[in-house]
């Protein structure tokens, strides 16, 4: 009998498409049957035909849509739609759901039984989407990776030992047993390392009634990264509390701690840890404190050239005050530390009061303020003034007493740096006036104000040009004389970034206190008058600086609107 008569439909199509010769096709078909594999899987594993070629051919021949799995956000796959047993048995994967219709990825278009079984099991209308077989296998493994999978080799992470808080001995021993559970140790280590590698700033470990989830804040946005079994909740919490030196038996009150992770022989990263009792257990949030972020240099922060020169000039002044303002998470600490690093030489005495100290810097005297123990910002400032300081940094000006001491220091031969939670440079000045700071003292002590936000940077690998009508550009505030001289880009998403953005860049309003602004302050002018004068003197506000970043192709207009529009 002729070999070609023995060929299945797919084998015949491969021969007709010159992807296989007849002899190889017959042998592959027989080998797949012996190994109890689908022909598609055998061909890909044997490297006889690529997964992409098979998918494209099958899509054309069977009239089924093809989709590249790597272009999809695998975190959004409806994992619970199909049981793991059924997924692995039929080698299918749930991609997305629309109403009562479930779309599943398959690599073998002839596997009609898979679609029938999925439809029967879920009660949903099921539509097949062709995907590449090699990518399908990886995606299935990733989808059902459990809390203890893929963690081998992480036990050797060097976590500095910390004493456990004084708890009841029996409770302590029970909790310690939970905390030392090997799979939990590996899972926690993996989460910490993944957060560091992904450039995340915060980790959230969150218990709920029926689920436990872990989320990372990356580039300012929270996203879910893991859903370990709910049964691991108490053990994960115990492990994190042991590492942070917290009292494991205390589950009714918030606690604060710290973890130091050594990621190489020369580099370690600190995590600030906070626990919060919730309805379903303790939520734990960790802030990553990477000292290298404060040593990137001013050029890496995103200042426009004229803004950078204003900051550097202010740092060279022998006395006065530099204020950095913005909401929580806007990068104020990094801006301050960057300035302190520039000033950190052997002939300058620098002291800082912080709540808490986030980044340890050699050569700088850093103090943790703790009002409950009698050390608040104002008391730290008074102590600094008796320590022969050149530069003083106050983590935040929160009250009139701290503001008055800081201003007095700035007027008596010291450089003072601090932050406020205000929206703009103009609002910073009026906030201090409203606190009760005398207008004359404020006008003569403040040298520079920096208001800032952090915007996500477009991924350079996948950003695409975005056409925007002229009327829209004018409405958004782009300069009329610049329209037509620049291109705007929008996010796409690729393997490098996942969502179209990678990293963040600062958007700044840098205002020098000029004689004209001093007059308005001494007359106790409002924020509108101050902002108008700053614009007249050529200082870009946050909105204008953000539009410049969009015109330069660094970020998108949508992102500028997100961080600068009230």
UniProtKB/Swiss-Prot annotation:
Null-mutant phenotype, please?
Answer: Mutants fail to make pili although synthesize wild-type levels of the pilin subunit PilA.
- The gene for this chain is pilB
Q: Which residues bind ATP?
A: 326-333
Mutagenesis or variant effect for residue 109 to A: In strain: PAK
In the record's own words, the domains note is: The ATP-binding site is essential for assembly of pili.
Establish whether keyword Cytoplasm is in the entry: yes
For this record, the Gene Ontology CC terms, alphabetical, are: cytoplasm; plasma membrane
UniProt subcellular location: Cytoplasm
Q: Which organism is it from?
A: Pseudomonas aeruginosa (strain ATCC 15692 / DSM 22644 / CIP 104116 / JCM 14847 / LMG 12228 / 1C / PRS 101 / PAO1)
The record ties this protein, via Pfam families, to: MshEN, T2SSE
- Indicate which residues the UniProt annotation says bind Zn(2+): 459, 462, 494, 497
What this protein is reported to do is described as: ATPase component of the type IV pilus (T4P) that plays a role in surface and host cell adhesion, colonization, biofilm maturation, virulence, and twitching, a form of surface-associated motility facilitated by cycles of extension, adhesion, and retraction of T4P fibers. Acts as a molecular motor to provide the energy that is required for biogenesis of the pilus and the extrusion of substrates generated in the cytoplasm. PilB ATPase activity is also essential for T4P extension while antagonist PilT ATPase activity is required for T4P retraction.
What family does this belong to? Belongs to the GSP E family.
Q: Which GO terms describe its biological process?
A: cell motility; protein transport; type IV pilus assembly; type IV pilus-dependent motility
| Mutation effect (residue 355 to N) | No loss of twitching motility
Identification of the protein by name:
Type IV pilus assembly ATPase PilB
- Per its UniProt entry, which superkingdom is the organism in? Bacteria
Q: Would the keyword Plastid be found if you checked this record's keyword annotation? A: no
- Output the Gene Ontology terms for molecular function: ATP binding; ATP hydrolysis activity; metal ion binding
Question: Which keywords does this Swiss-Prot/TrEMBL entry list?
Answer: ATP-binding, Cytoplasm, Fimbrium biogenesis, Metal-binding, Nucleotide-binding, Protein transport, Transport, Zinc
Subunit structure comment from the entry: Homohexamer. Interacts with PilC. Interacts with FimX; this interaction positively regulates T4P assembly and twitching motility by promoting the activity of the PilB ATPase.
Give the InterPro entries listed for this entry.
Answer: ATPase_typ4_pilus-assembl_PilB (IPR013374), P-loop_NTPase (IPR027417), T2SS/T4SS_dom (IPR001482), T2SS_E_N_sf (IPR037257), T2SS_GspE_N (IPR007831)
């Amino acid at each position: 009998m002729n070999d070609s008569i023995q060929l299945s439909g797919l084998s015949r199509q491969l021969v007709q498409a010159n992807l296989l010769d007849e002899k190889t096709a017959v042998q592959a078909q027989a080998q797949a049957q012996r190994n109890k594999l689908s022909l598609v899987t055998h061909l890909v594993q044997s490297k006889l035909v690529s997964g992409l070629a098979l998918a494209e051919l099958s899509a054309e021949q069977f009239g089924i849509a093809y989709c590249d799995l790597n272009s999809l956000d695998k975190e959004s796959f409806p994992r619970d739609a199909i049981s793991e047993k059924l997924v692995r048995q039929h080698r299918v994967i749930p991609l997305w759901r629309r109403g009562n219709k479930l779309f599943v990825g398959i690599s073998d278009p002839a596997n009609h039984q898979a679609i029938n079984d999925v439809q029967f099991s879920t009660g949903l209308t099921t539509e097949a989407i062709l995907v590449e077989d090699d990518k399908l296998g990886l995606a299935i493994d990733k989808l059902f990776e459990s809390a203890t999978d893929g963690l081998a080799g992480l036990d050797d992470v060097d976590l500095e030992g910390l004493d456990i808080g004084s708890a009841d001995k029996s409770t302590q021993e029970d909790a310690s047993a939970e905390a030392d559970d090997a799979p939990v140790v590996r899972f926690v280590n993996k989460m910490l390392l993944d957060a560091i590698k992904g450039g995340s700033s915060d980790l959230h470990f969150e218990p709920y009634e029926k689920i436990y989830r872990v989320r990372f804040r990356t580039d300012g946005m929270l996203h879910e990264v893991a859903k370990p079994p709910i049964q691991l909740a108490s053990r994960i919490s115990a492990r994190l509390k042991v590492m942070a030196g917290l009292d494991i038996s205390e589950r009714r009150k918030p606690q604060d701690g710290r973890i130091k992770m050594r990621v190489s022989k020369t580099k370690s990263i600190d995590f600030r840890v906070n626990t919060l009792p919730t309805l379903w257990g303790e939520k734990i949030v960790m802030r990553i404190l990477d000292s290298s972020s404060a040593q990137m240099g001013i050029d890496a922060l995103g200042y426009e050239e004229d803004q950078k020169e204003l900051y550097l000039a202010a740092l060279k002044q022998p006395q006065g005050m530099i204020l950095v303002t913005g909401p929580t998470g806007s990068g104020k600490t990094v801006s301050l530390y960057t300035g302190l690093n520039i000033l950190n030489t052997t002939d300058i005495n620098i002291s800082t009061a912080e709540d808490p100290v986030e980044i340890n810097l050699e050569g700088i005297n850093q103090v943790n303020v703790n009002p409950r123990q009698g050390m608040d910002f104002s008391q730290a400032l008074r102590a600094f003034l008796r320590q022969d300081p050149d530069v003083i940094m106050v983590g935040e000006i929160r009250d009139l007493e701290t503001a008055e001491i800081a201003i007095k220091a700035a007027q008596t031969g010291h450089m003072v740096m601090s932050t406020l939670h205000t929206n703009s440079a103009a609002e910073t000045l009026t906030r201090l006036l409203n606190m009760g700071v005398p207008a004359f003292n404020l006008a003569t002590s403040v040298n520079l104000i920096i208001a800032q936000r952090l915007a996500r940077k477009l991924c350079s690998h996948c950003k695409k040009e975005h056409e925007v009508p002229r009327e829209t550009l004018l409405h958004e505030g782009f300069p009329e004389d610049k329209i037509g001289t620049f291109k705007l880009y929008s996010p796409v998403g690729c393997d490098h970034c996942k969502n179209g953005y990678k990293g963040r860049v600062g958007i700044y309003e840098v205002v020098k206190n000029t004689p004209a602004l001093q007059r308005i302050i001494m007359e106790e002018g409002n924020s509108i008058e101050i902002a108008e004068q700053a614009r007249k003197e050529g200082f870009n506000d946050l909105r204008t600086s953000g539009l410049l970043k969009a015109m330069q192709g660094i970020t998108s207009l949508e992102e500028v609107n997100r961080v600068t529009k009230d």
